[in-house]
Amino acid sequence: MAIGGEMRLDDCQPAGREEKPMIESSSHGTANMSKDANPSVIAQHEAMLNALPFSDMRDFEDAARGFLGTIENGKIDHPQGRVVWSLEPYGFLGSEQAPPTVNPSLWRQSRLNMHHGLFEVVPGVYQVRGLDIANMTLIEGDSGVIVVDTLTSIEGARAALELYFRHCGTRPVVAVIFTHTHTDHWGGARGVLDGHALASGQVPIIAPNLFMEHAVSENIIAGPAMLRRAQYQFGPFLAKGPRGQVDCGLGKSMAAGSVALLRPTDLIMATGDKRMIDGVEFEFQMAPNSEAPAEMHFFIPRYKLLNLAENCTHNFHNLLPFRGADVRDALAWSKYLNEALQLWGGKAEAMCGQHHWPVWGSERIDTMIRQQRDLYKFAHDQTIRLMNHGLTAAEIAETIRLPKSLEGAWHGRGYYGHIRHNVKAIYQKYLGWYDANPVNLDPLPPVASGRKYVEYMGGAEAILARARKDLDNGEFRFVAQALSHLVFADPDNQTARALLADTFEQLGYAAESATWRNAYLFGAQELRQGMPKTLPRPPMSRETLAALRTSQLWDVLGIRLNGPRAEGKHIVLNWNFSDTGETFVLNLENSALTYSESVQAEGADASFTLARATLDEVIAKQTSFPEAVAGGKIKLSGNAMRLAELMGLMDEFPRMFEIVEPKRAAVT
């Protein structure tokens, strides 16, 4: 009985891949040759060099401050031999001058994100940075160390903790804090907590309220689609180099490695909550529905240290990531930052976040928080203002400009989020996908509309002739739109694929946003080479399964049901879990799988009694359902083949599906 695989955004990451000359022929027969930067792209870069304060080196000083030591080349290996993380392929970033194929502002951010190792923030507070996309913060108490966020992978977290021990001495981990629900902040928890600590329950795991609900909802329900879309956001399959992946804004990239979700033992419920942890007092502020649906900030009076999690970073953050998520609330985000100023303004002497580098000095800290507050408030209010003048999302994105006071702040640049796509997210939050123009109410899908566009525009050769001319003239955005219609109409047109790839490439070279660059360059690569091949998705880990409620497992089963194949079927199954005391009825009817809790159905097709732990073993493929029945772990009555019939109606989600070209296989 398979529910679904581990829904991580990093499990296809070929870490440590270096750039190679891209000249091989792809499976589509298109020469995989990257092009030089167009003169118009170079002109854009020169204009940016003149517009932004590149002589300001304060960020570089802050990023290097307090350095104690690192791991050579930032390289972390998995016990099975594969590379979990390595900065060695990014050696090309040693040059201060950006090449023509990388936006100079993004080049600057990419170089800042190369600082890696253990850093002292203030005596008693340390950070491991640059060994994952996220940071691990280590806070010394009276007898041990408190770990804030455990990076993406178990291997990375273990290496980070060992690095701290090597330079600061071995101390027991006395508590773990998860600032929010994204995988790069909790995935490595088993790397800092040994089996005894977990079994004894003596080490508290502290997290914001509703942590578990939100930690699993993104990764489990929409995981397959998110995983594929994340490849465009982070660029894991791009070669690393001046013509490939250079950064992702928040850090270098997602880490590979083993991930496990541990359930918190202590939830922070409200702003003003305090905890005394190993003699150190923490003051908490709740920040739900900001960068994550469950997130929190904290201040430590002993160290005069402020940590705003991921809500005050050295870039304009995402309000809607390319991988997909619920739209984040820019208005609430700005209010939380304003509240942080009211709570702790003038009190903090150091501020560190869970990405990027710290800031020191109360005046600089308060200035940065105010500017970040106003960045999200400006984006929110001006989007709504223009929306209420009747502008659509696309029109607002084309119109809005940050005020000069924010535009010139390095930490307000759009390396991860970007003003142009963040305003579209704000529009979506309030008005949804529809712009009220009836032409967009029920348009043709891409293949059908592509064929009609090609017909209306005079055929493929006419489009290609005009596209070549406009590409040379730097009209990349419309050339991409026109050629995309042609590729969807005729995906085997090698000339169209190659020209669209060249166009995406120029858009990537021009992009200041790392995520935009990754998306454009990966789109170009897939047009030239086709989709990369990946390994089968692994089953969910026992730790992740144990962290899920049984009702969440049924939700996952429901989204896998193939409705058309289930039409006309009615299956009712009773479940009784002996270890948790839970009972459920699963009901397939009207091509929908529903469940009721704390009841059993009379006349059910079959009934199963088992431990929830046994179900976890089956899903994790540590045993099979028939083996568990034969071994006495599952007791059944009725027609067990009805369960097999139900499972036969489940889809297996592919790891890969086409994005920049039509789906090759029909989906029903």
Which functions belong to the PLM regions below?
Residues 12, 17-19, 466-469, 475-481, ...:
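Feature captures hydrophobic
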Residues 28-45, 49, 305, 315, ...:
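Divalent-metal (often Zn2+) His-rich catalytic cores of metallo-beta-lactamase-fold enzymes
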Residues 110-171, 296-300, 304-310:
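Conserved beta-strand hairpin/beta-sheet module of binuclear metal-dependent hydrolase folds
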Residues 120, 144-145, 152-155, 169, 212-288, 332-341, ...:
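Metallo-beta-lactamase
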Residues 143-144, 154-206:
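Active-site metal-binding motif and surrounding structural segment of the metallo-beta-lactamase
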Residues 371, 439-462:
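TPR-adjacent "capping" and linker segments in tetratricopeptide-repeat scaffold/adaptor proteins
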